[in-house]
């Protein structure tokens, strides 16, 4: 893959504000979007069945996920052996989405994009911004629509006709009929669809053998599933036997349109020629929510990334200049994290000594004084943030426009970033001087303030994709480099 190009800060701003390329409808990107008529119709199962079957033919299968989700891409990576990249025009930009897709497909033989929710469901009820349809239009990709047929016969015609005609710019190339019962049920469905001449490119029967386990934040991550090889084997068989491959294969073949130059999605300042700062990345079953782009950006800026496990190690890696705690499920592993007292003590000492630290969501929970889990049990955590984090029944979810009210080593006063919240915990005691003032997508007024900034610790529930705010990553690496060479 070509190395990432570096540019000046003025060029960063110019690229991020450039409008997306409008592609001629005569030009087709290589690849296919898997969409659902709503959530829960089997979109992820279909996606994984196709990916695992393709991966048995080729080692160059590139997948993408629409939206900010972390867990579905973990399954993609298990299926293909390659990182799955998120396509999110709110967290990044339309231009970034196009460039990311083009760049990551350069060496791919097949490309597949898994959608989010229903085909036209996005960040607003007034438009389909950030929806699967939005991404399909940006990339000029055909759509394979997955329909749950478990309680349908002729009504399937109305559903598919509506999805095909709502937006003529979105090309529904075929459908997958999921959860089909008997042969008679399939006959009723195919008879109903005969009048609109829509290709039926897959039929999946009702079965529970390939159900993916889930819990309070969606699917259980792959790191907690020792049975994942068996699941993928069954999915591969499903993929090989339930789809019309002569029609699907050319749709999935990767290529790029000539109107859009293939260029890397990340434009960053050249990094210093001085030795790389070493940043420890907490990566285990408790902390696993990382966008691959974020890690790529840190590397591009000159950082050396050191993966490590707070669950398995009593000390952070030696000779480090920064810490990065992503989100995850510390509440599930609270007992193990609490039992590692030696590590908690060492981390508190290092963070109080101004070791640059970036913590999102689950990382914030770990740095708090106490974590109260789903059963109401209290567990001691690192104790850098003066608050108790408590699991709640209410899900906090959605895009946020965040305006900086308390500048720190990463963020400037009044700087605006877009992030995403997705958690079922809350802090009993809010930050005394919150980093961010938050506003929901499309809202006129702010609704909340949150985020901690203590010494060189930044901790927030907000998940950021640094493709949309590379200056944050730049500031983090600069702080780590400065820490390395402090007197």
List where the protein language model places each region:
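Extreme N-terminal, non-catalytic leader segments
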Residues: 3-14, 18-36
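ATP-dependent carboxylate-amine ligase catalytic core
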Residues: 25-139, 147-174, 183-187
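Structural motif
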Residues: 33, 112-114, 144, 176, ...
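C-terminal and late-domain segments of enzyme folds
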Residues: 136, 287-300, 304-305, 394-487
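Internal gly/pro-rich beta-alpha loop/helix module
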Residues: 153-271
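Acyltransferase
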Residues: 222-275, 283-287, 449-487
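Phosphate-binding active sites in nucleotide-utilizing proteins
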Residues: 277-341, 345-350
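Cysteine-nucleophile active-site neighborhood
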Residues: 330-408
